From Swiss-Prot:
Residues 1-61 form the TGS domain. Homodimer. Disulfide bonds: none annotated. Belongs to the class-II aminoacyl-tRNA synthetase family. It catalyses: tRNA(Thr) + L-threonine + ATP = L-threonyl-tRNA(Thr) + AMP + diphosphate + H(+). Residues 241-532 are annotated as: Catalytic. This is Threonine--tRNA ligase. Its EC number is 6.1.1.3. It comes from Oleidesulfovibrio alaskensis (strain ATCC BAA-1058 / DSM 17464 / G20) (Desulfovibrio alaskensis). Catalyzes the attachment of threonine to tRNA(Thr) in a two-step reaction: L-threonine is first activated by ATP to form Thr-AMP and then transferred to the acceptor end of tRNA(Thr). Also edits incorrectly charged L-seryl-tRNA(Thr). GO terms for molecular function: ATP binding; metal ion binding; threonine-tRNA ligase activity; tRNA binding. Pfam families: HGTP_anticodon (PF03129), tRNA-synt_2b (PF00587), tRNA_SAD (PF07973).
Amino acid sequence: MKVSIEGSVVEVESGASCRDVLKQALSGKKFKKVLAARCGGTMLDLTATVPTACETLEPVYADSPEGLGLIRHSAAHVMADAVQRLFPGVKVTIGPAIENGFYYDFDYERPFTADDLEAIEAEMDKIIKAAHPFERSVMSKDEAKKMFADMGETYKLELIDAVPDDIVSIYRSGDFVDLCRGPHIPDTGCINAFKLMSVAGAYWRGDEKNAMLSRVYGTAFPDEKELKSYLNRIEEAKKRDHRKLGTQLDLFSFQEEGGSGMVYWHPKGALVRAILEDFERKEHLKRGYQIVQTPQILRRELWEKSGHYDNYRENMYFTDIDEQPYGVKPMNCVAHMLIYKSRSHSYRDLPVRLFELGVVHRHEKSGVLHGLLRVRQFTQDDAHIICTPDQLESEIVGVLNFVRDVMGVFGFEYSMEVSTRPEKSIGSDEDWDRATSALVKALEGQGLPYEINEGDGAFYGPKIDVKLRDCLGREWQCATVQCDFTLPDRFDLVYIGQDGERHRPVMVHRVILGSVERFIGVLTEHFAGAFPTWLAPVQARLLTVTDAQNEFAEEARAALMAQGIRVEVDTRNEKLGYKVREAQLEKIPYILVIGDKEVEARGVNVRLRKGDNLGLKTLDEVVDIIRADCEEPFKSGGMRYSFS
């Protein structure tokens, strides 16, 4: 048979391996970078036989995303091998490749330590140098269960039972044996650069009722240069960790005695939040949204009607009031529909755009809670647009333009995904197809690139997920636009059309920032705590050299505050250098020094937090400088910053 490989047609003998065929078609230099093959969307080991129906055989290179995933998956096996060599009696569970590396979960008598990681790395080096080939074999489930039972690997027995087929695949590398679908790299020697990163606890299968395991995280790259670059980014990310900066800048805290996953906003953090929320309210009002406020709890029957009870119950909190069951809202859509239904609507009234900075509660397992990024109580900048089917595309486009303008203010680049129907969902196939088509049509009509994310939509409708990219190249999911034909039907939302008849509207669910808490966490890390001047809780601090300048410092503070500048005064009897350094550590944008010369000139010496010195300026000049700094981010979106 004949197979196409990178534009060349190769004659393939029956039973030939992918390795032999690719080696025949590629140059020696290119072939050295090949880790596996792909045929018809299926990845194959190089030792696998070329399928008889294969028309195109694609090499999978080490520097491709697929190749990187293979390296990391194989590195997880090498790590498990090393752990079994060093810690007799340890049981292995699962070890997949993940976004930035890999992990493996182990059941051992004690948690692993940092010293253990060093020993495991050293043992992995030995295994890699031995270049053990990864060898695939298949056997019946019964044979596999007997083999792993004899090895004492009880977790593997449970995994085998979950396999729907009668046959399972096994991979061997040296003396290590693992249950695995594969594929893998040719041999352990193909792992050129790796690093074990950390240890954490993880429940077996993510269930808190199961055994607590030790999860060892690692990463791997095609070469040392890429690994070093990644490790440098990790170190920078540690410096920017919003949890650390939240304490350093006195923005927020978490009080475990009050409950996990709940944020306590301190004055400066609450001010950042208030400024952000005020910005949101003004921008929504300018775009024709109406601000609403709705209750925290609603009768359970409403959540049953909406489908949340059947499809989202495990993420909700419930309580009884006067012997009536209630649910704490995880989303705002049901309450917004009740507002819409409280009065009749004509086609002339549509679209109706209801906006709420709504506090919601969602039960997240304690193991996934992470600072502001994953909490149990948070505020969504949530809006629901109820419109006619003819208005749907233009409303989606309006939301996408809103996202563009807001992300521009913060300087974020972003990408978009269309997330389609999940397995657990409500509504007809026809409605899902219509909704998905509307989202895709809006994106394509604006010439916006997107990817399809199969099966990740909300249970009531497909959505556009907007993923912003921070200064370290990390992606964060914030904004979403969801199209919903189902809930308007369940709640019998109607409008009177031009024909005088009742018609069913469509509903768009959307957030711009998403969770306000999460967005502030992302902002904190993106800016390393040095918020843009318009968002900084303290925009300027006046520092006196001696007590002789205290009176003028108070006059200057009053004058700046009168112009809408958020300013503090530091008149402590400390050395000026100490006070300047402290202000820089607190990331205050403008440090205004007052000595005798400044008092005489009725001005201040202006220093920036990054160290630049603008020299002596009058107070009016300082106001102009700070205002210009505040206004700059808003220019690209045609927006204006308000000092009110």
